[in-house]
């Protein structure tokens, strides 16, 4: 059965997967299987007398049901705030129905892809509901993509229409021009302009109006939305395995891959993330995580499940973070380590004490002791998460235990640095030898590859069957991350497989070296990669961004500091000062740094 399920699931990763999914897939409604991936009912349903599967006891899971419920239960409660723009949950529901209707009226049919290029503005929030409500697949795109990469992703996703924010119209047109040149037979993509709101305080009005007047577009967002019908009948998924979104990986290694999410996975991960974030009803969530990144860690849907309020931000800045926390009584937020760094390094005189405690989720790298201490001092409670685009964002959580509160800061930091245990949406999380698939000892020392299994693992890579097969070898999803496991079941990431530095036959964890570098008082950010060496094979090369006021520091001082805190073979032999390239989600683009280190050659 496992082989049959896998074989059938792979059928969707055809260049025309939308059509295959709907017509020939055994998961489609024509098989009458609903949420079951086989054509027949489960064995127990056939052998136990009196059981019957019907609409009375089964319907495909989908996060769009959260909005339907909130429109009734939380009808008049505020769903979204953007400047002085406020919507209730009923208004959001009505707007999403109209937008879904308008998309259908444009001739975009079930299974087609709708692309979106926008920051955390109301339209981006509404598209997460309206697109699947029309039976379509949302493809949120990284707002920091260049026209060349954007054109590749638009072609690969086979998007039929592109929603684009007014500030990104120039980039979108550049991508469409490249797309037209590369494929003469391709029909022109319809372009929907998300216009500037009068209440968009973070927007540059002059440049925005210039872009809108200089570049053409087919429809304007609000005008298109108003053309729709608020009585539109939602096009529910025929099967909960139907795709709800395609999320492209952040491009930290090479060209992004399209990760397919299902309605089922999005539903389960939304609830799991709500649980691990300890969200009770009526949370107030500040959007510092990009909605285009793993659908905002699935909290675009999760906040709706709890009838919460979304505080949208076009741009993330410490000033806007503190302002909105105080103004809207924010309870939860999230962000990469760069966001935490931004907060604690904000001009001290401008810090306003938080009026209440704020829960903040972070992932990407463990919080450093000095960052954690400062965040707690300011009134934030930091939770450490870990996951990948392929696991719908957060897949693990460093679940905090009350008995740890009395420990020293150093001990608490060590515990909080661990990536923790799987959340409730996953069946399994393990650290295994990727060659033997044996679980490594839980001694906190033996390294293996982190592997996931469960309902919140991606359906696969869009139109890349070989990559999907490789990722699922041995019936586990291979993360590519190296970790150790502790006796209590918590895991701790040590490095990416490809980032391990082998010097003189010794394995060096780049993460360990980065932690020491970042503990230096002058260092704001650091990333470590391998530099070729004729004698040792490779040596650590540190790329360092200094804090303001430390411009006179020398590389030798940083190297000496590392030698004082690490075995000498692990200390960087090279230090390069400057900005560190990152994706828009805050992940370091180490492939660019490796290229620089390779160009340096041997010491």
Swiss-Prot record:
Its EC number is 6.2.1.-. InterPro entries: AMP-bd_C, AMP-bd_C_sf, AMP-binding_CS, AMP-dep_synth/lig_dom, ANL_N_sf. Gene3D superfamilies: 3.30.300.30, N-terminal domain of ligase-like. It is an enzyme of class 6 (ligase). SUPFAM superfamilies: Acetyl-CoA synthetase-like. It catalyses: 3-methylbutanoate + ATP + CoA = 3-methylbutanoyl-CoA + AMP + diphosphate; hexanoate + ATP + CoA = hexanoyl-CoA + AMP + diphosphate; butanoate + ATP + CoA = butanoyl-CoA + AMP + diphosphate; pentanoate + ATP + CoA = pentanoyl-CoA + AMP + diphosphate. This is Isovalerate--CoA ligase AAE2. It comes from Arabidopsis thaliana. The lineage of its organism: Eukaryota, Viridiplantae, Streptophyta, Embryophyta, Tracheophyta. The gene is AAE2.
């Amino acid at each position: 059965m496992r082989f049959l399920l896998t074989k059938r699931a792979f059928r969707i990763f055809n260049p025309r997967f939308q059509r295959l999914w709907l017509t020939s897939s055994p998961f489609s409604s024509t098989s009458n299987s609903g949420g079951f991936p086989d054509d027949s009912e489960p064995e127990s349903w056939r052998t136990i007398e009196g059981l019957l599967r019907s609409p009375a006891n089964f319907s495909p899971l989908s996060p769009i049901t959260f909005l339907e419920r909130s429109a009734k239960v939380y009808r008049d409660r505020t769903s979204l705030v953007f400047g002085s723009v406020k919507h209730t949950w009923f208004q959001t529901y009505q707007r999403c129905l109209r937008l879904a209707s308008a998309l259908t009226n444009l001739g975009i049919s079930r299974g087609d892809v709708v692309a979106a290029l926008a920051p955390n503005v109301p339209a981006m929030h509404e598209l997460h509901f309206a697109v699947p409500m029309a039976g379509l697949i949302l493809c949120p795109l990284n707002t920091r993509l260049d026209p060349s990469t954007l054109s590749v992703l638009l072609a690969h996703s086979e998007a039929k229409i592109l929603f684009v924010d007014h500030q990104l119209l120039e980039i979108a047109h550049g991508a469409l021009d490249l797309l037209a040149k590369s494929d003469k037979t391709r029909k022109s993509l319809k372009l929907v302009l998300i216009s500037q709101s009068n209440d968009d305080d973070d927007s540059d009005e002059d440049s925005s109006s210039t872009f809108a007047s200089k570049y053409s577009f087919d429809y304007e967002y609000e005008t298109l939305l108003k053309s729709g019908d608020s009585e539109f009948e939602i096009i529910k998924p025929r099967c909960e395995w139907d795709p709800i979104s395609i999320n492209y990986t952040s491009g930290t290694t090479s060209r992004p891959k399209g990760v397919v999410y299902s309605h089922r996975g999005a539903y389960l991960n939304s609830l799991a993330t709500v649980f691990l974030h300890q969200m009770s009803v009526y949370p107030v969530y500040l959007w510092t995580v990009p909605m285009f990144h793993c659908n905002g860690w699935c909290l675009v849907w999760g906040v709706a499940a709890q009838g919460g309020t979304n505080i949208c931000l076009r741009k993330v800045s410490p000033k806007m973070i503190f302002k909105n926390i105080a103004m809207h009584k924010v309870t939860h937020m999230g962000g990469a380590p760069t966001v935490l760094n931004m907060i604690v390094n904000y001009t001290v005189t401008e810090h306003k004490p938080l009026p209440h405690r704020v829960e903040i989720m972070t992932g990407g790298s463990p919080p450093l002791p000095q960052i954690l201490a400062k965040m707690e001092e300011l009134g934030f409670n930091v939770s450490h998460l870990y996951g990948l685009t392929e696991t719908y964002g957060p897949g693990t959580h460093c679940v905090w235990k009350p008995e740890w509160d009395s420990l020293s800061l150093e001990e608490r930091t060590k515990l909080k640095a661990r990536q923790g245990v799987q959340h409730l949406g996953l069946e399994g999380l393990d650290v295994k030898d990727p060659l033997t698939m044996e679980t490594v000892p839980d001694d906190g020392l033996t390294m293996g590859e982190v592997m996931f299994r469960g309902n919140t693992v991606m359906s696969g890579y869009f139109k890349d069957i070989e990559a999907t097969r490789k990722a699922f070898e041995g019936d586990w999803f291979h993360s590519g991350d190296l970790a150790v496991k502790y006796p209590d079941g918590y895991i701790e990431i040590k490095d990416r497989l490809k980032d391990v530095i082998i010097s003189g036959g010794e394995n060096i964890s780049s993460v360990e070296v980065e932690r020491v570098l970042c503990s230096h008082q002058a260092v704001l950010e650091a990333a470590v990669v391998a530099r070729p060496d004729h004698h040792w094979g490779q040596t650590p090369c540190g790329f360092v961004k200094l804090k303001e006021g430390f411009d006179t520091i020398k590389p030798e001082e940083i190297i000496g500091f590392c030698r004082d805190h690490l075995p000498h073979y692990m200390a960087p032999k090279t230090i390069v000062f400057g900005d560190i390239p990152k994706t828009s989600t805050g992940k370091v683009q180490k492939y660019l740094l490796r290229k620089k280190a390779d160009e340096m050659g041997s010491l």
